[in-house]
From Swiss-Prot:
Keywords assigned by UniProt, alphabetized: ATP-binding, Chaperone, Chloroplast, Coiled coil, Nucleotide-binding, Phosphoprotein, Plastid, Transit peptide
Name of this chain's protein: Chaperonin 60 subunit beta 2, chloroplastic
GO cellular component: chloroplast; chloroplast envelope; chloroplast stroma; cytosolic ribosome; mitochondrion; nucleolus; nucleus
Task performed by this protein: Involved in protein assisted folding.
Amino acid sequence: MASTFTATSSLGSLLAPNAIKLSSATSISSSSFGRRHNVCVRRSRPAIVCAAKELHFNKDGTTIRKLQTGVNKLADLVGVTLGPKGRNVVLESKYGSPRIVNDGVTVAREVELEDPVENIGAKLVRQAAAKTNDLAGDGTTTSVVLAQGFIAEGVKVVAAGANPVLITRGIEKTAKALVNELKLMSKEVEDSELADVAAVSAGNNHEVGSMIAEAMSKVGRKGVVTLEEGKSAENNLYVVEGMQFDRGYISPYFVTDSEKMSVEYDNCKLLLVDKKVTNARDLVGVLEDAIRGGYPILIIAEDIEQEALATLVVNKLRGTLKIAALKAPGFGERKSQYLDDIAILTGATVIREEVGLSLDKAGKEVLGNASKVVLTKEMTTIVGDGTTQEAVNKRVVQIRNLIEQAEQDYEKEKLNERIAKLSGGVAVIQVGAQTETELKEKKLRVEDALNATKAAVEEGIVVGGGCTLLRLASKVDAIKDTLENDEEKVGAEIVKRALSYPLKLIAKNAGVNGSVVSEKVLANDNVKFGYNAATGKYEDLMAAGIIDPTKVVRCCLEHAASVAKTFLMSDCVVVEIPEPEPVPAGNPMDNSGYGY
């Protein structure tokens, strides 16, 4: 304790000069202080400089044409990736090697056009891809192509003198009615069809489809499947049982298996402390209970200081106690949330002084139970005993609600991570490739496939290959009869014509005439009949495994219609005038030309 007081007194001496300076500051005269104050006030009003804006009015239709040019440039670029025979897009990277991608939303995010009005058009239609990606995780290219179709057909009729307000109202009502029709066409996905859904989304890669289906079968349809970048050229799948996080044991002296350098305990008790453990005396009651009960105990705390840690290690080495300790995962508020999650999984109570719980008075009632704990130098896995499943399910629902409210992607990612850890079984797919460029492209495809499979589980499946959207076009005539206004009916007709765009583009990318393909498909009354672009055959697409998740098709339709409505209602564009680049000043020390 003497050293502590010494440190404190020396700290006081270090602070003394500052104190003198502060007291001398008070001796400044009121007049000089006033002058200083006035100067400060003047400085606190920075000059406000507003960038000039350029206004583009749509008097002769040029503004809308420019916006549409931006839409078409983005849609044509993204469109080359659509379908089983779609090609890749190479993206330049300022740092590192170029990226080769087949993912619509990734391509769309990279596009910045030189003309500011065209760029706004591209940004408008990019929203359809981004929103579809956020909600369904796939179908981004289809959203862009469908939005292009709505806009192209809509611009024609608006240019001919139709009222854009009534036109967009007709598009909105028709899209809403078609979503209801889509639900009637949908069917629940069978386990055997999950692989087909994933394979179609991964560009007809059946190996990826089978792996995702296997992962789903191991952890259940509502289980958690995550992706990692693998170290080899092959794809791998493994399942992590229990809650796993990136924190290892504090001291290697806790190790029970010297070959693996790991700590393994069965039927282990857990003590959770949301503060630093500074004194070993605070742990005496809990440790004596563990010795009497003969059970192993795992301590998870913010930190364990040297004195307390030494006591734990000595008792472990003597064989008196089966014990291990680690620092709580996460930092700040997230650390407390992780501790609460562990408490719910194991049935423990977190020791927190703010809720009236102190460590020195803790007994058996605050301890949690785990059927198994495994600690390595860098990782800890806790497998619950299954008695707290109801509480875990409630916690997962709470976290899902937080995800819906979260605005930042990073926050959503961390919340999804917590759900994955709580769910008790996480399937991990390691994506392998020969090069880094191939790995990034492959990972995007597998991510799309995984998202499509999850979407299929949520809302069911429909026939793929763009055929469902084409079949929905035949439902538009009945919807038109429910619309009272003639111009709203024109809006419905716009939707009808645009619904064929995705199928035509899939056919075009496969080297076939899209109009001929759509006519042949519509000539057959069987709703499952369509064009298989991968094989070039007309067949029963459901039997051939060409399947789309209903949720993906619904999101494509809704978001494309929403973007088209915004576009067609626009009549003026405001853009910033870029500031001229400053002319570099000459070097005042440059004496060249003066004979030196």
